Amino acid sequence: MFDSTLNPLWQRYILAVQEEVKPALGCTEPISLALAAAVAAAELEGPVERVEAWVSPNLMKNGLGVTVPGTGMVGLPIAAALGALGGNANAGLEVLKDATAQAIADAKALLAAGKVSVKIQEPCNEILFSRAKVWNGEKWACVTIVGGHTNIVHIETHDGVVFTQQACVAEGEQESPLTVLSRTTLAEILKFVNEVPFAAIRFILDSAKLNCALSQEGLSGKWGLHIGATLEKQCERGLLAKDLSSSIVIRTSAASDARMGGATLPAMSNSGSGNQGITATMPVVVVAEHFGADDERLARALMLSHLSAIYIHNQLPRLSALCAATTAAMGAAAGMAWLVDGRYETISMAISSMIGDVSGMICDGASNSCAMKVSTSASAAWKAVLMALDDTAVTGNEGIVAHDVEQSIANLCALASHSMQQTDRQIIEIMASKAR
């Protein structure tokens, strides 16, 4: 429960962060399908003998090349199979956290027997859509997720409809925190971060705990493209400076290496993405450590980073052709700038420079190479902060950047929401042709 004296708008900010910043084990698109399969299996009478699944093109894009934790295998079929045979239907984005070695073996056997199919849902007007149907003989159960990675809208079995989400908001029901967030500004978010009681936001420190553990695992060098571990080696060899800038990139990319490589550790996600959560967290943690920040300063910086990232991403489709590590890194830029001097002008200049720098980075599906984009975004964020500290930034005379940071954000999000839709279709077409 919230302190009744807390500003009602601030309460909605905190709710937005609590809704959007959650632990997630494994890349969230395959995990969304695994969750649908797990919930369906929980409704089925008897053991699962067959799994059929349908997903949106965007979800297919983000599930083709990513490793499912604990399996050593990539793709949506193993995610669906393991969700059905070893998933925890009540664990949300951590649906696979309790999967046993036996469940993994059973899932692989089901796959090898040709009993698992995943197809693109046609037609499909939803950006994020996953449906899993599990069978035991003639008995079946089907679960549909739409709009959000854990947003179950329909459950049905051979006996009839079990649950259907109501589309309308009940009279007197409060609107979504994200709806409230769509009417705010970065200046209001900064005021909240500066003035909210520490006790109300202490929970955000969990993002540092989880993502630092993932980063440490990534530095072992056995996950994904091991970018973080490789860059750390280059520091030891004298090919890369041992400085704050390198540390930001190394520790951030290491967490993404472990995340995308299939490590069985959760990430603290942001806006439904583990990589976005990592990108919004690790640069801020590294800078906070450099300046010896205490828990309260770290919590305020992390809250600014995560809430700014949510605020920007809320103006985008849930999944798009724009790599959202870039928008999460804009949040990180805000958090790092706040740690250094706390001025709104510095924060807004850093975000504007980010928009002028990495806004063209595409999302070509979840894979080990996401860690490359995470490292690039983290590096760009710190560069933008350093520029802002010297009172320089990409200005409104250049490209899609406007004189006002809010308009710059709106311009970027309009680009991703509209004209980049054709880019997204082309990316999906290219990836589908490779998979044939």
UniProtKB/Swiss-Prot annotation:
GO BP terms in the entry: L-cysteine catabolic process to pyruvate
Domain of life (superkingdom): Bacteria
GO molecular function, one term: L-cysteine desulfhydrase activity
Pfam families: SDH_alpha
InterPro entries: Ser_deHydtase-like_asu, UPF0597
Family classification: Belongs to the UPF0597 family.
Protein's recorded name: UPF0597 protein YhaM
Provenance organism: Escherichia coli (strain SE11)
Gene: yhaM
